[in-house]
Amino acid sequence: MMRAKLAGYLERTQVVFNRYPASDNSLPALYARAIARNCSGKCADAMGDVDQLLREKPDNPYFWELKGNLLFWVGKHQEAIPALRKSLKLAGDESLIQAELAQALLATEDHAVLEEAIALLRRANALDDDNSMTHHQLAKAFYMKGQYPQADLEAAQAHFVEGNVKQAQIFAKRALVKLPRGSPEWIRAEDIVNYKEQT
C-alpha cells in the first residue's frame, strides 16, 4: 500500500495509470489512482475510488484521510470534517491528520470551532514542530481570534521552518512588541529575531 501511495503522490498521472490500469481493482491500485486523480484535479473520479476503498476497508484511517482531503480540496470543508474525524479516531495521535482536521475546521470560518482547531494544532506541533503548515494554520486561528501577537509568532515560526529567516524575523519582531516580556512566547520570538544564518 505504501508503494501505491507514494506512486499516487509522486509519479505523473499517466505513469500511475499505466502501472495501475483501470482493469486492476486491487486496493493498492484503487488507492494509487484515487491519489493521482486528486493530485491532477479529477476529484470527482477519485471519490468513486475512495468510496470503493472504504467499502472494502472501512477501518483504514488513511482511506478516510484521503476522502477528507478530496472533499476539502473541492471546497466542501464542512463535509470533509466527519471523514477527517473518523480518520483521526482510527489513526490515533497522527500529527498530519490532526493538522488536516484543524485546517478543515478553520476553513469553515466558524468561530465556534477555533478552540478545537487550536488544540489539534498544538497537539500536532508537540508531535512534529517542523511542519510549517501547522504553524501557518495556528497563525490563521489566532488571527481569527484577534490574538495578533500569537498569530505573528506562529507566522514567524512557519517562515523559520521553511528557511525564510528574514520573513520570520519580520513577524517575530512584530510579536515581540506585544507579547509579555520574558514569557515563553516572547522568548521564542526573541530567539528567531536573534538567529544568525550560517554562512
Model-derived features: positions:
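Extracytoplasmic and endomembrane cell-envelope/extracellular-matrix remodeling and assembly machinery
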Residues: M1-A83, R181, D191-N194, Q198-T199
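Helix-start (N-cap) detector for alpha-helical repeat units in TPR-like alpha-solenoids
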Residues: L27, P61-Y62, Q78, S95-L96, ...
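Canonical tetratricopeptide repeat
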Residues: A32, L66, E100, Q137-L138, ...
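Residue at a conserved register position within TPR or TPR-like alpha-solenoid repeats
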Residues: R37, L71, L105-T108, F142, ...
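Structural motif corresponding to the intra-repeat A-B loop/turn of tetratricopeptide repeats
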Residues: S40, V74, T108-H111, K145-G146, ...
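Terminal, low-structured helical/coil segments at or just beyond the last alpha-helical repeat
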Residues: M144, A155, V161-T199
